[in-house]
Design a protein with these regions (language model features):
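Surface-exposed, charged, gly/pro-rich loop-and-adjacent secondary-structure segments at domain edges
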Residues: 37-65
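Aromatic- and glycine-enriched beta-alpha-beta binding-site module
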Residues: 1-40
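Generic structural motif recognizing short loop/turn segments at the entrances and edges of beta-strands
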Residues: 7, 16-21, 53, 57, ...
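Long, solvent-exposed, polar/charged low-complexity segments
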Residues: 38-40, 61-131
Length: 131
């Protein structure tokens, strides 16, 4: 099938390395630039999502593989420049080894991914414009 640039959901099971995660990896340059522009243009909405205490409880860090400096076309002194330095817009929540054997596992996964969905919806809204 065709690779989607949209945020996806990911469940990883590994001894001492299990996690619930999601995001968009390896975005084409034009889409990555558009996502950054969307964050910049709608920073209040983005911050309301990623700095919400319920969101941060599961996802304290946004992104992977960061630029060392501000991306081209964005002011270096932008208060939230770190959100624009992401090359991969992903979030992950590490879980203990016994997580997947707990009786409330599905409810817990639902809680985590409900928080992630707000982030995914924000990113996917921009990506939708490219389809």
């Amino acid at each position: 099938g065709k690779k989607s640039d949209h945020c996806g959901y990911y469940v990883h099971l590994q001894p001492d390395g299990s996690m619930l995660a999601g995001g968009s990896l390896c975005l084409p340059t034009n889409i990555l630039k558009a996502v950054r522009q969307s964050i910049y243009d709608n920073i209040e909405e983005f911050v309301a999502i990623v700095e919400d205490p319920e969101f941060k409880k599961y996802f304290p860090v946004i992104g992977e593989d960061f630029l060392k400096t501000a991306p081209k076309g964005f002011p270096k002194d932008f208060k939230y420049i770190d959100y624009l330095k992401c090359k991969e817009y992903v979030c992950s929540y590490n879980v203990p080894d016994d997580f997947f054997t707990r009786p409330d596992m599905l409810e817990q996964i639902d809680k985590v991914f409900r928080q992630f969905k707000r982030f995914a919806d924000f990113i996917n809204y921009t990506i939708d414009d490219f389809e």
